[in-house]
């Protein structure tokens, strides 16, 4: 059975996209708001953010350790219940009036918000979903491609 120190050792091996911090810098420079909407766990996100000195608001499920791991899903949508964090509801709440949503994702929990975002960058399972369901999406391999797109806007 794993404990908190085992999890932290595992999380310390995780890496982020090599262009992610450059992407964040460009967004800050241009006044674009960035949020991480995750169906993962706060404990994991915090560990990765701390390792890479990232300060971005995020929404995720809660992982609580008090001798054993417990999960809380404060962002679930009771009417749906598919994901622990309803990214679509959060995206709509955070969008604000007249703003364009550029949604970046790769997994199953990104499928619903991808159908409602203005611009979608997708890879892996999300790209397959978009392709198979007629959702307009730009395939990406890394954040460098998203940086190029953002720079082309101005």
Where are these regions (language model features)?
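Metal-dependent phosphoesterase signature
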Residues: 1-22, 30-32
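C-terminal cap/substrate-recognition subdomain and adjoining C-terminal extension
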Residues: 18-35, 40-154
